[in-house]
């Protein structure tokens, strides 16, 4: 079976994986953990954790469970409390991260529960923050601010050096095909 590694964030990566899982492939998704918007952004600030939202979306896309379970993971609370706009799957990943101390271990646990087709790995266990440098020499910190700015980007980097997980590096080395989404 061909080993396919797909690297990316939540939206594009999730759509691609929904299609790829229909083929006889050994899929590994390596997911960015630099998201800082919405529920993920709040959880990052509150619990000092890496981003979990894109991981949640990838878990749902590779899962082979009842549609109700997918709906549960994607469910967002609509309330006037602190839970407002939090995704249930993000809360679950945050709890597992606090229990295991590792995104990789959290994903391994949820992958078993959700009958995941393939493997999901975080790009890093570090708290990655994106920094964009624009064509007009502006510096924008944070993925959500970069998106909202609508500026022409010269280059992007992390605010500080991050360590790629050993599992992600190993998956890339063993891949027959690498896809960027």
Give a label for each model feature.
Residues 28-33:
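Short internal beta-strands
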């Amino acid at each position: 079976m061909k080993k396919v590694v797909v690297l990316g964030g939540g939206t594009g990566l999730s759509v691609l994986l929904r299609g790829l899982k229909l083929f006889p492939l050994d899929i590994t998704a390596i997911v960015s953990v630099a998201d800082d918007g919405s529920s993920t952004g709040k959880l990052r600030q509150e619990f000092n954790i890496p981003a979990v939202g894109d991981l949640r979306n990838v878990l749902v896309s590779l899962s082979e469970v009842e549609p109700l379970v997918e709906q549960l993971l994607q469910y967002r609370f609509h309330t006037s409390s602190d839970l407002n706009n939090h995704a249930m799957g993000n809360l679950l990943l945050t709890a597992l991260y606090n229990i295991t101390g590792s995104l990789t271990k959290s994903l391994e646990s949820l992958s078993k529960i959700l009958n995941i087709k393939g493997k999901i790995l975080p790009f890093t266990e570090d708290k990655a923050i994106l920094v964009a440098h624009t064509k007009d020499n502006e510096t924008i910190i944070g993925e959500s601010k970069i998106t909202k700015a609508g500026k022409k980007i010269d280059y992007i980097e992390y605010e500080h050096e991050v360590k790629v997980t050993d599992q992600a590096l190993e998956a890339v080395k063993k891949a027959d095909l690498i896809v960027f989404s």
